Structure formats: C-alpha cells, structure tokens
Amino acid sequence: MAPKTGETVVEKMEVDEAKQDVPATEPAKDLNAIAVENIKEQLAALDKGEEHLITRVLQVLPKTRKQINDNVLYKLVSSHLSSDAQFAEGMLKYLHYTPAADTEVQPMDTSNVKTKSPKKGVKPVFASPESDCYLRLLVLLHLYAQKKNTEALALGENQLTSIYNFDRRTLDGLAAKTLYFLCVIYEREGRLFDHQGFLNSRLRTATLRNFSESQAVLICWLLRCYLINRQYQSAAHLVSKVAFPDNASNNDLARYMYYQGRIKALQLDYNSAAGYFLQAQRKAPQEGAIGFKQAVQKWVVVIGLLQGEIPDRSVFRQPIYRKCLAHYLDLSRGVRDGDVARFNHNLEQFKTQFEADDTLTLIVRLRQNVIKTAIKQISLAYSRIYIKDIAKKLYITNETETEYIVAKAIADGAIDAVITSDVRDGPRYMQSSETADIYRTSEPQAHFDTRIRYCLELHNQAVKALRYPPKKKIAVETIEQAREREQQELEFAKELADEDDDDF
C-alpha cells in the first residue's frame, strides 16, 4: 500500500550489535607441574656435563628452592632414571610423602595386548652423576627448610661421599653448595667446633683436586669456626697458609674479606682492617644480604672510632642500619663528646648486645680514646686545672692514675701542656699552652695525603676492573704463503714492465 502524502516513513537502519567480548577463563596453572618441568629441564642440562650449564643451573638455585615441596620432589625422584638402583628408594625415605589417590597412575589393562620384546642391543640411558647429586641437593634443601637437621646431615654426608667417589671437576659446584648447607646445619646444632677436623680434611682434598669453589667455601667456614671459638691465632695462621681461589664467587670473597678484617682488627692493625671491611662492603650483593651488611657496618663504625674518625650521621639514618646501629650511635656520641659517664653507661647497658656482635673487645679499648678526647676538651677549656679536678671529670678515683693518663696524652702529642706544681709536694695541676694554629702544622698535610692515597687506590681498582676487548690475532703467514706472495709480486712487476714497453 502506498504511503499517504504528508506522512513520513521512518525506516529502521540495520546496525550490527556490538559483540561483547567475553573474557575466556584461563585454566588455573598447576604450579607443581610447572616446577617439575623446569627442574627436569635443569636435569637435562646437567646431563650434558658442561661446566657453564652447571653454573647456570646453580645460579637459579635460590629461585628453584622456592618451588620445591614434597609433591614436586616425589614426582622428580620417582621419574628419575638413575644408574644407582637404590637411588629412588633412598631419596623417598627422606620425603615421608604419600601421593593422593587421584594423582596415582592407574595401571593399564594389558590383558589383550601382546607384549613386545625389547630390542636387542639397546641399553637404557641413565642419568648422569651431576643430575643425581642435584636431586640430592634439592632434597637436602627441603629438609633444611623444614628443620629436619638429623636427616639433612645424613643425606649431606652421603652426598659428599658420592661426589668424592666420582672425582669429577663438574661436581665442584654441587659439592660447594652441599658443604655450605652442611656447615649451616652444624652451626644450627652447635656442633661446628666438633667438625673442625672434618672441614680441614675436606679442604686438603679440595686443594689436591683443584676444587676451587669447595676451597672457597671451606676456607670461609674454617675462619668462621675459629673466630666463633675465639681461636684468633689459628685463624691468622690459616690465612697466612692458604691461597684463596681467584675464581671464587663474590659472596665467598666478601665473607673472606670480612673475616680477614676481623682478624686484623683484633691484631690492632686498624688500617688494614678498615680496607678489608671496605672491600667486603663492595663485594656484597646490592640487594639482599642485609644481615651481612649490618655485621660489616658495625665493625666499620667501631674501627672508625678507634682510628679517631666519627661516622657520618647519614649512615645511622639508613633504613637497614637504623635499628641495629642504635647502640653504636649512642656510643659514637659519647666518644665524640668525650663524655666518660655516657660511654660507661652505654657500655654497661648494651654489653650483651656488644658481646653478641663480637665487638666488645674493641669497644673496651675505646675508653682510652674517650678519655683522650675529654682531656683535649679540658685543655682547651682550662688554661690551668688541678689533677684532682680532672679525675672528677673523668670519673677516676685515683689521682695518680689520672696524672699518668694526662702525661701519656702529653707524650703522644694529643695536648700541648705540662704538669707542674707551685710548691714542692704541693697539689699538681696541668698548665695548658696557648692554642696554636693547626694549619701551621703538618697535620692537614697528613690528612690530605691520606685522602689522596685513598682516591688513587680507588682509581687503580676501577681501572683494573675494566674489561677491554680481546686483541686481534695477527695472522702469521707460512713459508708457502710467503713464496706465493713473492711470486705474485714478481708477476705483477713483469706486467708493469710489459705495459711500459708497449707505451714506448
């Protein structure tokens, strides 16, 4: 029917309705299955027996530790084809894990299937000793995390016996990791001192077989054992007799520098100790290792105070040091101000903390520095003061001892004064000389010389740490190549001569 005039017809336009994208729900990832696949890839890399692949696997070991559990280890051990027939049984007894019923593999119905005879001459491919030892190491780390120390020690000792029986250079990294965690468990059990002979024998074996990573780990743990048991002479003797491996990791090198710094500090060689602690801080990881950095910084503060240097306030304000260095901040204030009363109060109040940090021996020696600073301030404040008044300010009951201390400060050049009395057998007093301009002395020159030497040493270390491109190999021609080159030159000369003749 035709539309009437005057009426408008509105036609609906066909518009494609916008399709709503419904996000597809991703299936939940099985973290255990992912971990099993990742570790199987690592085991396949270890089976190749190449050192750089083994190093790469051990570098990601901290990440792998977070992925392992009873389920993952059970699947790995059950599917691992080791040359040792009792490997799986020996590992599973440490796990104490029973798989769930739904995860067990159901047997196939093979009643109507004809069995095929295996091919003749085909031998099964067994896993390498590297992958066996790596699986043992993962089980050891799992037991260590669960604090099953007895089982972990038994497994670790079996692991070391197996490694040293194979005598392979590629097992050095795995042996070093095993030794490290064994020593950690020994220390946790309080039995580290009882295993000094064991560590020494392992160090001899590692040195004879050139196991550099094992050497580095054993040297560090022997030094730690000696220092914990206060066998400082034995620690110094060990450092003088062994050669630390050049290709050791930065973590082991940082520990070695830290222990050397402690030995030098207890030998009162503060300059060398400060240098070792500085290198330990540089070699420490940029992220993590907070406990190690805190331990090093405590010794740095004490060594600086013994050298007459007051630590910068910004050090104590850093988040990782704010809490652990609170006692050392109060100690530094007492040393800076020469406040003997405050120093004695801090020493008595935080004595337990200083003993735990093994810094109490050096902090007690700081008392002489505090007294010397106090005497300096007294000599600047008083042109003349009686010895008995100095004894009151220094909280010393004996005037004779106070006079000896003042005389020692005068002899060391700490103050410019004399001890005298107005009459014979009268009260003795300290007469200070007029303060001289320090810039007229050689002390600023000595300070500038120390700073310049430090900057030059830092520059030299930076230059040594640079990496340069390898030199291009200059090709050395053989006798035949030289003869061919000479023959070509003669022919070329003849051609040039012929061309010249043609031109004429």
Swiss-Prot record:
It holds the Pfam family PCI. Keywords: Proteasome. GO terms for molecular function: enzyme regulator activity. Residues 254-433 form the PCI domain. One of its GO terms (biological process) is ubiquitin-dependent protein catabolic process. One of its GO terms (cellular component) is proteasome regulatory particle, lid subcomplex. It comes from the Eukaryota. The keyword Ribonucleoprotein does not apply. PANTHER family: 26S PROTEASOME NON-ATPASE REGULATORY SUBUNIT 3 (PTHR10758:SF2), 26S PROTEASOME NON-ATPASE REGULATORY SUBUNIT 3/COP9 SIGNALOSOME COMPLEX SUBUNIT 3 (PTHR10758). Belongs to the proteasome subunit S3 family. The 26S proteasome is composed of a core protease, known as the 20S proteasome, capped at one or both ends by the 19S regulatory complex (RC). The RC is composed of at least 18 different subunits in two subcomplexes, the base and the lid, which form the portions proximal and distal to the 20S proteolytic core, respectively. Acts as a regulatory subunit of the 26 proteasome which is involved in the ATP-dependent degradation of ubiquitinated proteins. This is 26S proteasome non-ATPase regulatory subunit 3. The lineage of its organism: Eukaryota, Metazoa, Ecdysozoa, Nematoda, Chromadorea. The gene is rpn-3.
